[in-house]
Curated annotation (Swiss-Prot):
CDD domains: PRTases_typeI
A Gene Ontology cellular-component term: cytoplasm
Catalysed reactions listed for this entry: AMP + diphosphate = 5-phospho-alpha-D-ribose 1-diphosphate + adenine
Protein name: Adenine phosphoribosyltransferase
UniProt similarity note: Belongs to the purine/pyrimidine phosphoribosyltransferase family.
Annotated localization: Cytoplasm
Gene name as annotated: apt
Keywords, ordered alphabetically: Cytoplasm, Glycosyltransferase, Purine salvage, Transferase
E.C. designation(s): 2.4.2.7
Biological source species: Bacillus pumilus (strain SAFR-032)
Length: 170
């Protein structure tokens, strides 16, 4: 199935010159959303995944149905101040400054095989930070899955050494 036909490209959003990839027009078609999810599920099965980790918010949209299909748990990565219990955190760079991502300190057991999911691989900063959180807790990043990769931003370079699945490339 050609998933790109279900992604709406919105010009000049959120700012001029950006070609925003809107996945809601993929997700609102049940059979298409299921197909995309199933591709990631098959990838995960090949890697003997114990847990799915996804950064807010679209990492939840991708990761939760995969976790459900596999019968494994899902651990959210959130911005600082959004998780109620003790967390580990990592600071990461943004285009104009820094931000902090967190995960519950007890979300991952040492040795658990983790699949990190997100909607989009752009510069790789968010996923690089997510990897650091998983590994700090003793998890093994067994794979990383995205719906979309923006190849011209070279985000894959930050993830060198990790196994990556992308369903669409622009």
């Amino acid at each position: 199935m050609d998933l790109k036909q279900y992604v709406t490209v919105v010009p000049d959003y959120p700012k001029e010159g950006v070609q925003f990839k809107d996945i809601t027009t993929l997700m609102d078609k049940g059979e298409v959303y299921r197909y995309a999810t199933d591709q990631i599920v098959e990838y995960a099965k090949e890697r003997d995944i114990d847990l799915i980790v996804g950064p807010e918010a679209r990492g939840f949209i991708i990761g939760c149905p995969v976790a459900y299909a596999l019968g494994v748990g899902f651990a959210p990565v959130r911005k600082e101040g959004k998780l109620p219990r003790e967390v580990v955190k990592v600071e990461y760079g943004l285009e104009y400054g820094k931000d902090v991502l967190t995960i519950h300190k007890d979300a991952i057991r040492p040795g658990q095989r983790v699949l990190i999911t997100d909607d989009l691989l752009a510069t790789g900063g968010t996923i690089e930070a997510s990897i650091k959180l998983v590994e700090e807790l003793g998890g093994v990043v067994a794979g990383i899955a995205f719906l979309i990769e923006l190849t011209y931003l070279d985000g894959r370079k930050k993830l060198d050494g990790y196994d990556i699945l992308t369903l669409m490339q622009y």
